[in-house]
Amino acid sequence: VSGVGLPDFKYTEAAIGMDVAANFEGYPEQCYVSLVGKGLGLDRQHAIDLGLPGLTTGDLVDMLRTGAMPKINQLAGTYYVYPQMLDYIRRADIISVQVGSNDALVPALVALGNATNWKSEQLVATLISGVLRTPSFENLQRLNSGLSRLRLTREERKATTQLLLGGGTDAICEQAYQDAAVNMPQVVAQLRALNPDAQIILLGYTNPVPLLPEWTQLFRRLNALGKSLAAQNENVTYVPIPFAMTATDAHPTVSGHKYIANRILRAVKK
């Protein structure tokens, strides 16, 4: 695909759903969109980041219909009107998608905020930093220590403990999976309708809160969903990223972006 005044390139890549940067040409050099672009010999007009912060699978379904969300997502506090997105998708040769984590993370963070009366910012950073990645007694102590530093009232501590350790996010994770199971087939179908020829890459998921069993199960199911959708649809490739490291905001670290880029490049059909 070539653009006006630009040299010809073999590929145009559009990346959807990972909110690396709001500006489609303003993403960091170290992010996976940039690294994949370089690996395919693309400049920034041809390696395009379409990720939007806080986007859920339902939001993406709406965006792929009209280029806009019909209303604000109240939990995430997001509202996007981005009709150019559809043009980029129509022109792309490779479309990578990772969306679904926010379906669980957004309501869970709101629930945690409500439980702590919004004293929970530091605890959230600890939970998604990766330091609690391995289930162990030491990490349970670390979690309890983090709760203690919040200076919660008795009622707040009880509500937070129930949410985090008493299965309080079970319903959130189940609803997130059900939403993704309904929406992700629509996402794939809408992408294919917009662009019949592009290779669609469904990126796998990493678990930002692996200490909690219900979250481990959720992301295992989301990965299975992505793999199943790829098997059911022509020219759709599932790319697992089990070892992508995440930072305190649940997004990939620099090394995580490099790992994801390498996984995508290996999956691209030459």
Regions found by a protein language model. Give the residues of each.
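Short, flexible/disordered intra-domain loops and linkers
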Residues: E25-P28, M63-M69, L211-Q217
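Serine-esterase "nucleophile elbow" of acetyl-processing enzymes
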Residues: V1-M63, N114-T116, T253
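Residue-level marker of intrinsically disordered, low-complexity segments enriched
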Residues: A14, S34, H46-I48, P70, ...
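Alpha-helical cap/lid subdomain in secreted, periplasmic
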Residues: N73-K269
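Short, well-ordered amphipathic alpha-helices
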Residues: Y32-G37, A68, Q186-A189, A224
